[in-house]
From Swiss-Prot:
Pfam family, one: DUF493
Entry-linked InterPro entries: UPF0250_YbeD-like, YbeD-like_sf
Family according to the record: Belongs to the UPF0250 family.
Protein's name according to its UniProt entry: UPF0250 protein Lcho_4239
Organism: Leptothrix cholodnii (strain ATCC 51168 / LMG 8142 / SP-6) (Leptothrix discophora (strain SP-6))
Amino acid sequence: MQDIPREQSLIEYPSAFPIKVMGAHVPGFLEAIVEIALRFDPAFAPDSVEQRPSKAGNYLGLTITVTATSRDQLDALYRELSGHPMVKIVL
């Protein structure tokens, strides 16, 4: 797959940008993700988080929608989410 140059982003900024985050269904997971989202988007609405537990209840899928203002912001947000110890995958 070929990388798209930064100056040719397919995303128009600012825009509402949904991010799916999957992690262990443990106390504090939702709060940790909301805290990260708020650092990158101070207008983020914590009550807008969509939650989906796995069938067995071991994992929790979250969809957060942030206001994306730049590719750098999104890259940093993905890095921070992916690096969090409770997070298994970020899409």
